UniProtKB/Swiss-Prot annotation:
UniProt protein name: 3-ketoacyl-CoA thiolase
The protein's annotated pathway: Lipid metabolism; fatty acid beta-oxidation
Highest classification ranks of the organism: Bacteria, Pseudomonadati, Pseudomonadota, Gammaproteobacteria, Enterobacterales
Span of the signal peptide: none
The organism of origin for this protein: Salmonella agona (strain SL483)
Alphabetical list of SUPFAM superfamilies matching this protein: Thiolase-like
Subcellular location: Cytoplasm
Length: 436
């Protein structure tokens, strides 16, 4: 094992996560229909600051992400600063790492803290699948540019006459990989077939996720980390995730048809995460700054790792690649963990990664490691459910997982937790957290 790389400042301070918050997560075109991601981000950051009672000028940086970006607000981070009453001099920039975007935001704030350029910052992400940048065809886009430069009405009419009716149809955002044309669900189908994951196994994991999430809400475990929201016309509160199906049975899952490979597939809408709207954020600072402000941190960021693999086959294996690296940098093994939380993009993807984490052959032949990362104990795995149940607003999921894991570690008396996710483009992310 290589030497551990502790995340500390030049003064030896640990990187503290003092609080975290998220909106409830809403299925596409439901509670947050018509609410853009930038407004969801303002909601959560404004409420996070109000609850923390931290002086507004104590936050020196805000790093925020959005995967489905809107052209009118390309720097969502700066718009959040300007829209929440934060100090206008607060540095703010936006990041994007697909489904691992808020992992990246957290890493960036941590690096600023370690460099000593700031002592406190906010990291997070927001996405809306209900407010989308609906585009136009390439043919229409080109004509519109040319029309803007045309000098006469006749020239403009000539340009428009070149268009066909199909060129006028709106173009929704792409749901496929730019480089391969494969949809995420196509990759999940690849993984199910490669690793022999059955429909029954996928449905069982999805059912488990919903049952655990419903139980977490019923026991009040999420109340402190999920805010109540009000949206126009501001009459009814929206306070709980609306995708969770606590009353579902395994028989219900079996009724659905495959969503991607219609003839021979096993990936369905029920064993996949749904399109979702929501936002999440965390406040981070140096350990000494937290003490100065009289704050007890939720926990600490011990290590992180980002990885990348090829996109043509089984590209959602990011957790199997990034987890051993994050553990190594933390100076830990799988056995040292109290909790292990993996983003459930698809049940097939989740089960494939769990299989490979325990595979000696994968460790030796693919990762070049002497031994497997380790089997994940079911008693430690996604104990409060995962993304299949909660939903997945792309840029917000990492911050949700971090906050949720730290709260659960605190309830268990402390320990180490690892959160990990796959992401489009063959990317992976993992972070080791510590709570006392």
């Amino acid at each position: 094992m290589r030497q551990a790389l502790p995340l500390v400042t030049r003064q030896g301070d640990r990187i503290a996560i003092v609080s975290g918050l998220r909106t409830p997560f809403a299925r596409q075109a439901t509670a947050f229909h018509g609410i853009p991601a930038v407004d969801l981000g303002k909601m959560v950051v404004g409420e996070l600051l109000a609850r923390s009672e931290i002086p507004a000028d104590a936050i020196e940086q805000l790093v925020f992400g959005q995967v489905v970006q809107m052209p009118e607000a390309p720097n969502i981070a700066r718009e959040i600063v300007l829209g929440t009453g934060m100090n206008v001099h607060t540095d703010a920039y936006s990041v994007s790492r697909a489904c691992a975007t808020s992992f990246q935001a957290v890493a960036n704030v941590a690096e600023s803290l370690m460099a000593g350029t700031i002592r406190a910052g906010i990291a997070g992400g927001a996405d809306s699948s209900s407010v989308l940048p609906i585009g136009v065809s390439k043919a229409l886009a080109r004509v519109l540019v040319d029309v803007n430069k045309a000098r006469t009405t006749r020239q403009r009419l000539t340009l428009f006459s070149r268009l066909r009716l199909r060129d006028l149809l709106p173009v929704p955002p792409a749901v496929a990989e730019y480089s391969t044309g494969l949809r995420m669900g196509d990759t999940a189908e690849q993984m199910a077939k490669t690793y022999g994951i059955t429909r029954e196994q996928q449905d069982a994991l999805a059912h488990r996720s919903h049952q655990r999430a419903a139980q977490a809400w019923a026991e009040g475990k999420l109340a402190e980390e999920v805010m109540t929201t009000y949206v126009p016309p501001y009459k009814n509160p929206f306070a709980e995730d609306n995708n969770i199906r606590g009353a579902s049975t395994l028989a219900d899952y079996a009724k659905l048809r495959p969503a991607f490979d219609r003839k021979h597939g096993s990936v369905t809408a029920a064993n996949s995460t749904p399109l979702t709207d929501g936002a999440a954020a965390v406040i981070m600072m140096t350990e000494s700054r937290a003490k100065e402000l009289g704050l007890r941190p939720l926990g600490y960021l011990r290590s992180y790792a980002f990885t990348a693999i090829d996109v043509w086959q089984d590209m959602l294996l990011g957790p199997a690649w990034s987890t051993p690296l994050a553990l190594e940098r933390a100076g830990l093994t799988m056995a040292d963990l109290t909790l292990f939380d993996m983003h459930e993009a698809f049940a097939a993807q989740t089960l494939a990664n769990l299989q490979l984490l325990g595979s000696e052959r994968f460790a030796r032949e693919v990762l070049g490691r002497a031994q497997a990362t380790g089997e994940v104990d079911d008693a430690k795995f996604n104990v409060l459910g995962g993304s299949i149940a909660y939903g997945h607003p792309f840029a917000a999921t990492g911050a949700r997982m971090i906050t949720q894991t730290l709260h659960e570690l605190r309830r268990r008396g402390g320990g180490f937790g690892l959160v990990t996710a796959c992401a489009a483009g063959g990317l992976g992310a993992a972070m080791v957290l510590e709570a006392e």
